[in-house]
Amino acid sequence: MATASEVQSLNDINYKSKIKIALLVILVFFLFVFSFLSFYPIGDKLKSVIKSALSAQGCNPDFDEVHMEWLLPKIVVSNLVIPAPCLQRTGPALNFSHLTINYHIINFAPFGLPFRIDTSFGGQPLEVYLVQGFSGQMIRLKDQALDLAKLQPLFGENVKISGKVTVDLNMGINDNVISNLTLKAQSKNLVIPPQNIQGFTTPPLKLNELYLEAISESSPRIQIEKLVVGDTDAPVRANFKGKIDLQNGNAAMSPLDLKGEIAFSEAFRQALPIIDMMFQAFNQKDGFYQVRLGGTLGSPKPIAQ
C-alpha cells in the first residue's frame, strides 16, 4: 500500500502538462515528415531503387511519376509499365494508367503492414489487399467481379476465355512460393472461344456455369475441392476434384491428377467427331464419361478410369 508521502508525490505530477508536451513532439515529428515527403523527389528516388533491385532479375518496370496524397493517405503511381519478364513470361508489357497504394492500420493476422492497391486494366477495375510481413506477403481479393475478356493480356496468348467471374482469394507467399491458398471462383456466363484440337476447330463453347473451390496448405500442392463446368444446356459438362502440383515460374507444366466425369451434347459430338474416337475406351455412367485427367495444366491428358 502506498504511503501518504508517495500519494502526495503522485498528486504533484502535472499529467496535463506532460500530455501537451507529448502531443507537441508528435505534431513536430509529423510536420517534419510531411514537409520532407512533400518536397523530397520521392518519385525519382523510388524509381531508382526499384530499377536497381529488379534489374538483376531481368525486370525493369517503369512509370512516369509517383507522389503522395495526404487526404486518406496514399501513394499514387501514374502510367506504370510492367515488362513481361517481371511475370516470368514473354509478350508485350502490361500498362496501367494509374495505381494507388492506400495505407491501412497495422494487421496482426498475419502481422505486417497492410495496403489496398487500386488500379484498372483494360477498363477492368482491380482492388487488391496486400499485407507485407517480415518473411512474406498475404494477397486478398474480396469477391472481386472480373470481366475475363478485358483481362485477356494477363493470361497470355494460350488462354482464351470470356465471361464474368467472381473471385474470392486469400493467398500467402513466402520466398516467391505460395505457402497457403484459399480460392473460390464462380461464373454464370463463361464462354470459351473456338479452339484447335488436333487439327479440328471447336465451335464456341457457351458453358455458362463455372464453380471452383481450391485450397493449399503446403507448397506446391493445390487441392481442387470442387470444379464444376457447364450447365444443363452446355455442350460440355464436367465435374472434377483432385490435385495440382504447381510449378513455380512455369504453371503450364504443373502436373495434374484430377478425377471426375465429363459429358458432351449430341450437337457438339457431331461438330467434333474426334470426341467419340478419343473416349471410346472410357466407361460411362448416366451419360458421363468417367475420366482421370493427367498430363500438365497446359496440356491435360484424359485417362480412362
Regions found by a protein language model. Name each.
Residues S78-P83, K142-K150, Q186-P193:
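Generic short beta-strand segments
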Residues P110-I117, Q137-M138, S219-K226:
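Short, hydrophobic/aromatic-rich segments at coil-to-beta transitions
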Residues C59-N60, L87-I101, D118-E127, L151-M171, ...:
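Amphipathic hydrophobic-ligand
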Residues S35-R116, S120-L126:
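Terminal hydrophobic membrane-targeting helix
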Residues P85, R89-I106, T182-R221, S265-K301:
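Beta-propeller and related beta-repeat scaffolds in trafficking/envelope systems
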Residues Q144-Q152, E217-Q223:
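Flexible, solvent-exposed coil segments and beta strand-coil junctions
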Residues P204-I274:
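Intrinsically disordered, low-complexity segments enriched in Gly and acidic/Ser/Thr residues
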Residues A2-S55:
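N-terminal type II signal-anchor transmembrane helix
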